[in-house]
From Swiss-Prot:
Coiled coil: none annotated. It comes from Klebsiella pneumoniae subsp. pneumoniae (strain ATCC 700721 / MGH 78578). This is Large ribosomal subunit protein bL36. One of its GO terms (cellular component) is ribonucleoprotein complex. Keywords: Ribonucleoprotein, Ribosomal protein. The lineage of its organism: Bacteria, Pseudomonadati, Pseudomonadota, Gammaproteobacteria, Enterobacterales.
Length: 46
């Protein structure tokens, strides 16, 4: 899963990509091609 600043280009990679909001984070999910998954707003680990 990629962590990106903007999901605009991530949701346009495939026609089946959907934008979903879960627990305050934005996710792009794609059931037909799971390598296009992405997330915005993930907390950084130290």
């Amino acid at each position: 899963m990629q962590v990106v600043n903007s999901l605009r280009s991530a949701k346009q990679r495939h026609p089946d990509c959907q934008l979903v909001k879960r627990k305050g984070r934005l996710y792009v999910i794609c059931k037909s091609n799971p390598r296009f998954k992405a997330v915005q707003g993930r907390k950084k680990r130290r």
